[in-house]
């Protein structure tokens, strides 16, 4: 089936918005499990060892790590497909289209990290979590915009989407560079050879998805064993998928479209269910003001807000970018707060940054409180800044910010 860039964007917004609502439900369910009589069962299930053996080798991991290392590789594969499409044919394919989201996203990555560092500079053991508040959960953020309906112009959703894609690129780079403790060269070499074979299929524009599935699993195994985080195999695999196969079918967009529902309604909610369960037993309000959770929360609330809005304002005022005609500054301010919903990616990076259960619990408190406050304040500002946009054609409605 033929999918235009506009159709792909509309499908993406629809799926991720609906998925955001499911994600909210999964997060609430995790909190209920972790703070009721079901807590022991909940944490016991996540700690259950699961072994998969093939031939003479195999992998044995707790259920939680199968979700974080295995299932989330599918999520990162979809992220990789979206990034490749946006760079080749979408909102990041030219400077005119990409300038505003690029500059805004840069501010939204740097400022939260600086806020976190400033608050945790006196506690060196926390500094490895500097990237936690730099992330944006696109499913949650678009879910919030979806709840506001027509009060939010499509151009604002497109701007948020572009910022989130750039944010994902940065998160992938951060994970690869800063959260890879050691590398097993033999396994990394095997992964590289597998990736070269996949690239050959991509260059030949092979139209079957079977080689990508089979070799993708092999690539994931080698990357896992190499010491590099296994989810990055998903991103690498996505880079080998051709935009158009030899028969002229839009293979990348077709694959992206086929995966959306699975990721939005299964993969990410399962991740949330497994990772958002923080026990509040014995936790006092003062725990929120400890450096680690406070740095994360303020990074998401203040850092994202000042970074995205401030850099976007400077870019427009200095002539480096242009604000879409249907979007006002009050709406950009609301967007900058909604982008402070870190959730999925923030929790994911938190699990990479820390091994101590107490620190991971503090990360969850910071991410949940910061994301909740950012969402509520962002919604209030977007409601205040709501205006009825003029009717536009389908192409104009999905056109990226210029």
Curated annotation (Swiss-Prot):
Transmembrane segments: 18-38, 63-83, 99-119, 129-149, 158-178, 182-202, 210-230, 258-278, 296-316, 329-349, 365-385
GO molecular function, one term: sodium:proton antiporter activity
Keywords: Antiport, Cell inner membrane, Cell membrane, Ion transport, Membrane, Sodium, Sodium transport, Transmembrane, Transmembrane helix, Transport
Catalytic activity: Na(+)(in) + 2 H(+)(out) = Na(+)(out) + 2 H(+)(in)
Topology class, membrane: Multi-pass membrane protein
Single GO cellular component term: plasma membrane
Function according to Swiss-Prot or TrEMBL: Na(+)/H(+) antiporter that extrudes sodium in exchange for external protons.
HAMAP family given in the database record: NhaA
Name this protein carries in UniProt: Na(+)/H(+) antiporter NhaA 2
Organism: Erythrobacter litoralis (strain HTCC2594)
Lineage: Bacteria, Pseudomonadati, Pseudomonadota, Alphaproteobacteria, Sphingomonadales
